[in-house]
Amino acid sequence: MITSKIRKALLLTVSLGLAASIGVSGPANAASDNKNDINPKPASALKQGGTFVHVVVDLCPQFNTGQPAGNLLNCSQVMNTMLPGVNYFDNKATLVWDANYVTSAKVSKVKGKQTVTYDLNPKAVWTNGRKFGLKDFVGTWNARNGTNKAYENTSTIGYEDIESVKKGANDDQVVVTYKKTFADWQAVFNPVYPAELTASPDAWNKLWLTGPTLSAGPFEYVTTDKVARTTTVKRNPKWWGDKPVLDRVIFKAVPQVAQIDALLNGEIDFMDVGNDINAVTRARGSDKLRVQIAKAPIHEHLTFGPVTAVTEDVRVRQALMLSLDRRLIAKTIQGPIMGDAAAENNNHVFLDGLYCNQDNTGDLGKQNVAEAVKRLEAAGYTTVGADGIRSKGSQRLSIKLIYPSGNVNRANTVLLVQAQAKAAGIEIVPTLIPSAQYFVAPNVTSWPNGKYELALFAWVGGNYPISSVSNLHKLGSPQNHGQIGSAAVDALFSRANNILDLQKRCKLANDADKLQYQAVHSITMFQRPNAVAVNKKVANFGAFGFTSIDWTKVGFTK
């Protein structure tokens, strides 16, 4: 089983976590230089067995990754060993159908409607012995299409465009018919959830709160130990594909500030160092570790929570963006890792490494304190206090910015933002949140549960940017934390999702993005590489970037 590094919905991370025509040649959105860095070795060159200790920032609170509480990188990392998906991205970031589950997928027009026919691997089964098949596809669609609002969802995109999911010519064929064209159809059913989980809203929302009861991957769930702070998976004896090299994978929760010591002491086998220059320096100085780097769809940003009396005025949001020298921040924070390549990110949708990338920031992209002041005065913030902070009547121009503990890079970013914003008369109040509480209410959680004003975190994207990112901007979507958007933006993204011409899709998505920059939905800071420090004895694991992980091949060299 090969699992997408990131599934269709974007994932939150505190770790510091198409084809142009309808076909399977994609992704047309990926650039040609998206190489991974994983120390590739043939399975025959590896020791058979062993336990890989995979660090996570916290225990997963909800193992259903399609449910908002499970929309976390640490949950996806665990479930990627167990959940089936229809395709993956190989070492060249090219889409490939996963023959462990789908032997072929063909798209056609039937009575004028887009129709996808999946031929399933007849050997595929869940750990309860039930065959992987139509019931799972139907259940996944029913749970995720938005028809029944009791199913709490991270995203309905793609599924809401499906008209029917039916049996094909035999029991191993599934036919999906769309109501209207959906360009990123290859992203749908990644993953496929078991019918037992999708049987009812109660099952969907609660059944996997303490652990996944079923697997159809090379590993199966064993236990979660809240004292040891670990989740363990082991080889799935019912797995029909290539035998995994490893016996077990332990996902161990370690605060980020303590991860480099744990890695150097051999307690874990890797850590993400992309947001911790101190860890990079120490890892590079160790003869036991390898630092691996790959371009990746990860971007740091300042996102507004539900708007307040201060942040509801778009002129205030625009002024904050204008007050920031995002390039200086990028070079200060990312320069030690990326060198001269460190730069600000100017596109919410298409990051560097994806086709259609362009600068959509307009007149807000470069620091302009004078213009920031002008917009603040137009918004009524004309009084300047002795401390340099502006006010409008009794309302002080103050914004609380939350950030997670144990993250040096984020702490430094917040200090830079605070200093630069003050030059325009905006008070940024840094508010440290324990990392274990950062992605739970009332902090960075799906709308309307998150109650923060402004937060610093990263979105981890993937190779289907239009369909996945549109969910972050759609009004009413739980992932649009501040509900900043418009009907015009929704319409542009909807059109981009429902046509096949790549050039037209890109233009529509970029037009939507330009509107969102003017609305200051969020302030994109910089794109981070996938940078990890790994035990030198580990093979087929590391910086995956835009490619997928094959958990059957991960292991230790002889």
Regions found by a protein language model. Name each.
Residues 104-150, 175, 310-312:
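Aromatic- and charge-enriched surface segment that lines or borders ligand/interaction sites
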Residues 324, 341-385, 405-412:
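Structural transition elements
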Residues 40-45, 427-439, 467-536, 558:
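Extracytoplasmic/peripheral linker and loop segments enriched in polar/acidic and small residues
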Residues 73, 91-92, 190-244, 248, ...:
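Gly/Pro-rich hinge or "lid" segments in bacterial periplasmic/extracellular proteins
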Residues 45-47, 117-119, 153-202:
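Surface-exposed binding/hinge segments that line
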Residues 144-154, 166-168, 222-234, 250-308, ...:
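Extracellular/periplasmic solute-recognition and catalytic clefts
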Residues 54, 129, 275, 419-479:
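Periplasmic binding protein-like
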Residues 52-109, 142, 214:
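N-terminal lobe/hinge region of extracytoplasmic solute-binding protein
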